[in-house]
C-alpha cells in the first residue's frame, strides 16, 4: 500500500515529474562543461517493474527533457535489480547512450560478461561497468583484466572510505564521529549540537587527500597488475639496516609477490 507521506518514485507520478524537472535543471547547468562525461539517470533501481515498462518510460522522459537543453552529454542507463537487469530497456532510444551495469559480492569467472556482451553487440550501444569494489586486490586485478579484455570501460567504488582497507585512501575515524554513529545505532548518548558540528568538521578535514592513508597496493592491483606478473618493491625507501614492516611485502600478484591461501572470490 502506497504511503504518500514517504518518498516513492515508482508509485508517484508527481515524484516522477519532479525527477524529470530536476534532470532538466542539472543539464541546463552543466550542458557546456566538457569535463563531465554524461548523466547517470537513476542509480541501482531495485523495484518490481514488470517488463521494465515503467522504468523505460521514466528514462525516456528524462532523456527527452535533457535533450531539450543538452544534446552533447552521454546518457547512462542502469538496469533494474541493482543495475543488472535490462529487460525492456532495448532497443536504445537515444543515439548517445550507454548501458551501465554493476558487480559486487560474487566470484570473478571468465564468462562473467557473457550475459551482457551480446546486448552491446546486438544494440550497437557501449557498455560501462559503472560501479564495483569492496573486495580483495586479487579480485580487483581479475575483474578489471576481464573488463579491459572485452573493451568495457569501468569505474570503482570508492576512492576514499572511513576506516577501511579496500579503497585507495583510508580515512581516519575520529572519536566525535564515532559518537554520532553510536547514537544513531542506539548504543550511545545523543551528542550536543556543538559536539556534532565539531565532529563533522573534523571528519571533513580527515577526508582531505593529504590527511588520508594512501594504500598504494590497491591502485597497483587495479592498474599495473592487470598487464604484468612483475614484482616491484613496496617502497624505494626501505633499506637494511633499518625497519621493514611485515605488511610491506613486494607489490605484485598472489604467488608472485606473496602467498596467501585466501585472496579473492567474493570477499
How would you describe each model-predicted region?
Residues 1-88:
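Active-site mouth of glycoside hydrolases
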